[in-house]
A protein has these predicted regions:
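Helix-biased detector of long, well-ordered alpha-helical tracts
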Residues: 1-329
Length: 329
């Protein structure tokens, strides 16, 4: 019987697709692979409530964050839009306006655009490449147990913001819209529609002579990001529940919609925050110079696995979508 993706898991499927090819999949610590992301209408966004300019901006953030996580300076950005018949020139111009704004903000030197017809809604495909300084490459330390797990911002907010938008869409369609709720949870909604990353983070780290030993962008929840770092470094990792940063209204909204913000942080999507591992000897300097980052855990010996540590000290194995159960042990 043919295996399904749900049985094999995304990560194992990717690994097996490379088996016997003579190629190795570019990993978390790769310095040459371009960053690439595809956004599909109806899967990754809903144009009923997603402003086109925000969509263009977010698409660039998604690939730029991958470059920053690998300590690369943005160089070139390539965008291909699959355009459906329902979209006109003005709408595509609005979307590309968001792309251009982000490209300027993050310092890209080249920007290209291609347009293709689409029968199945809007498709936004973005690829970015960047350059790592030779001195940074030489200085990059080997990942070690006790390296600190440091996150650039709040987690779970994008997933919770999406729930607010979806709930408001249902109300809008039934004629019972609540504008005051959108205002109340605007920070959560903003985390989903218009995520932000620190544009000068690579320069700042290089100037401070703090070079992360590893880094990933949180795209499918913190659990997935930690497991990707664990696979790339060959080490375990411990994340502490009480150290995870949340947006202010996360727990109030979580109670209202019966969603645990911790689960949203661990397995929600599109937070687009950068997770670095910083050598523990750089702790005091990093805390002083990068106060917007939160220290949420540390790398550990491989036998420790990847775990979530509760305030009571219990260690719970991380589970992440796309990973087989044995990969989560």
């Amino acid at each position: 019987m043919a295996q399904t993706f749900s049985e094999i898991g995304k990560q194992e499927a990717l690994k097996q697709l490379f088996d016997g090819s003579g190629f190795a999949a570019a990993g978390t610590l790769s310095q040459t692979a371009p960053a690439h992301r595809v956004f599909l209408e109806g899967v990754d966004f809903n144009l009923v409530y997603f402003p086109l300019k925000h969509l263009g901006y977010k698409a660039v953030v998604a690939v730029t964050g991958e470059l920053f996580a690998a300590m690369r300076h943005p160089e070139s950005l390539s965008v291909v839009l699959g355009v459906s018949a329902k979209l006109d020139y003005e709408q595509i111009s609005e979307l590309f306006g968001g792309v251009k704004a982000a490209a300027k903000e993050f310092g890209y030197k080249e920007l290209s655009l291609d347009l293709q017809p689409s029968k199945n809604g809007l498709c936004v495909s973005v690829s970015a490449s960047g350059k790592q300084l030779e001195l940074t490459r030489v200085r990059r330390p080997k990942p070690q147990s006790k390296d600190l797990l440091c996150i650039s911002g709040r987690l779970g907010a994008a997933y919770l913001g999406l729930q607010v938008l979806e709930r408001e869409l249902v109300r809008f369609e039934s004629g019972s819209s609540k504008a005051e709720e959108m205002e109340k949870y605007k920070m959560l909604v903003g985390a989903y529609l218009h995520p932000e990353i620190p544009s000068g983070i690579v320069d700042s780290l290089e100037d401070a002579q703090i070079i992360p030993s590893a880094g990933v962008l949180v795209t499918h929840g913190l659990a997935d990001a930690v497991k990707r770092i664990s696979r790339a470094t060959g080490l375990g990792a411990k994340v502490y529940t009480d150290k995870i940063p949340f947006e202010g209204n996360s727990f109030e909204l979580g109670r209202n919609i019966d969603v645990d913000p911790i689960s949203a942080a661990m397995n929600g999507g599109d937070d687009l925050q950068i997770l670095f591992t910083i050598p523990i000897l750089q702790l005091e300097k990093f805390r002083k110079d990068f106060q917007t980052f939160e220290i949420i855990g540390h790398l550990a010996q491989a036998e420790a696995g990847t775990v979530l540590v509760t305030p009571e000290g219990a260690e719970l194995p991380l589970r992440a979508q796309g990973w087989k159960e044995e990969e989560s042990e």
